[in-house]
């Protein structure tokens, strides 16, 4: 489907020369003299190469049809990460390139939004937070309650984060998936 270049936003998927690109940033530039242009910074989905393109705002760009659906994470193996559509029970395998930084936060049975193009996974959207267990952290020292200093900790998925001094190993905590930061102690 052709759309005006000026209508593209971050996250849009564009088909250029038979290859898919995801828009990382889109900026409409209106110079004092001349034609307004749209500057697109994109990443090629197949190999991760970043490209920058400039279009007149009225130019038409081929927008790829992307299907965003809920999928349940099943497991990962040498082939990739396996997901199931809970409505049709169809299974899809996403590669490590598609999953990227989301890999440590995937848990069996977790519902994620998987973006596909022609039934090939191209992007994943995790839930905003996950509950993980602290496996290792320094013991808290008495009398440190006045300061708001955080201490390093290792989560059950191997990711390092910082937690308040009263959190001990074995405690379940809520973690933001976008940056791995501590939110709160998990409620049982």
From Swiss-Prot:
A GO term for molecular function: translation elongation factor activity
CDD domains reported in the protein's UniProt record: S1_EF-P_repeat_1, S1_EF-P_repeat_2
GO cellular component, one term: cytoplasm
Annotated InterPro entries: Elong-fact-P_C, NA-bd_OB-fold, Rib_uL2_dom2, Transl_elong_fac_P/YeiP, Transl_elong_KOW-like, Transl_elong_P/YeiP_cen, Transl_elong_P/YeiP_CS, Transl_elongation_fac_P
Pfam families in UniProt: EFP, EFP_N, Elong-fact-P_C
Annotated GO biological process: peptide biosynthetic process
Annotated pathway: Protein biosynthesis; polypeptide chain elongation
Role noted for this protein: Involved in peptide bond synthesis. Stimulates efficient translation and peptide-bond synthesis on native or reconstituted 70S ribosomes in vitro. Probably functions indirectly by altering the affinity of the ribosome for aminoacyl-tRNA, thus increasing their reactivity as acceptors for peptidyl transferase.
PANTHER family in the record: ELONGATION FACTOR P, TRANSLATION ELONGATION FACTOR KOW-LIKE DOMAIN-CONTAINING PROTEIN
Gene from which this protein is expressed: efp
Compartments in which it is found: Cytoplasm
Keyword Cell membrane: no
Keywords: Cytoplasm, Elongation factor, Protein biosynthesis
Protein name as catalogued: Elongation factor P
The species this protein was found in: Caulobacter vibrioides (strain NA1000 / CB15N) (Caulobacter crescentus)
Keyword Chloroplast part of the UniProt annotation: no
Family label: Belongs to the elongation factor P family.
Domain of life: Bacteria
Main location: cytoplasm
Lineage: Bacteria, Pseudomonadati, Pseudomonadota, Alphaproteobacteria, Caulobacterales
């Amino acid at each position: 489907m052709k759309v005006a270049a000026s209508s593209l936003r971050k996250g849009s998927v564009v088909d250029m020369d038979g290859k898919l690109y995801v828009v990382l940033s889109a900026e409409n530039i209106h110079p004092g003299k001349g034609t307004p242009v749209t500057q697109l910074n994109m990443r090629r989905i197949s190999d991760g190469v970043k490209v920058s393109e400039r279009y007149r705002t009225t130019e038409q760009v081929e927008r790829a049809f992307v299907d965003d659906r809920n999928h349940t994470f099943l497991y990962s193996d040498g082939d990739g990460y396996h997901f199931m559509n809970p409505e049709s029970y169809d299974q899809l395998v996403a590669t490590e390139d598609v999953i990227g930084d989301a890999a440590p936060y995937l848990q069996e049975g977790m519902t994620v939004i998987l973006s596909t193009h022609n039934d090939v996974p191209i992007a994943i959207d995790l839930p905003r937070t996950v509950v993980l267990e602290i496996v290792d952290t320094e013991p808290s020292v008495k009398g440190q309650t006045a300061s708001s200093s955080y201490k390093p900790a290792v989560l059950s998925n191997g990711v390092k984060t910082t937690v308040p001094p009263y959190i001990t190993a074995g405690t379940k905590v809520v973690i933001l998936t976008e940056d791995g930061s501590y939110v709160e102690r998990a409620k049982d």
